[in-house]
Regions:
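DUTPase catalytic domain/fold
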Residues: 1-126
């Protein structure tokens, strides 16, 4: 039985997507990479594809957080401050459970997101 993990969504199978990894054995979060290049204009927001979906137990959810280096160095933040991926989002009919990351550029300069750039961290959590 599979407990939790990541898979690549069908539309991105041939696009060389990396599954999330933890940087070290003590890292809490799994680094999520951008699956595409995109420019986020100063003061604007953009949705970044990851090419990923996540499976988990029914009493779990995946918390999505901005990487602190992006917030500090690039002036980016998640549009909704923190993302929540519910267990039943996996393989849903609308988009196969594709995890999309909404970012807002609160800086004064455009920011370039490149494919493979680590843009967020995902943490597995249990809800009550």
């Amino acid at each position: 039985m599979r407990n939790r993990g990541f898979e690549i969504v069908s539309d991105f199978k041939d696009k060389h997507i990396n599954l999330p990894t933890r940087k070290t054995s003590k890292s809490a979060g799994y680094d999520i990479e951008a699956a595409e290049d995109k420019i986020i204009k100063a003061g604007k927001m953009a949705v970044i594809a990851t090419g990923l979906k996540a499976y988990m137990q029914d009493d779990e959810y995946l918390g999505i957080h901005i990487r602190s280096s992006l917030a500090l160095k690039k002036h980016l933040n998640l549009v909704n401050s923190q993302g929540v991926i519910d267990a039943d989002y996996y393989n849903n009919e609308d988009n196969e459970g594709h995890i999309m990351i909404g970012l807002i550029n609160f800086g004064n300069e455009d920011v370039e997101i490149t494919k493979g750039m680590r843009i967020a961290q995902a943490l597995s959590l249990i809800h009550i």
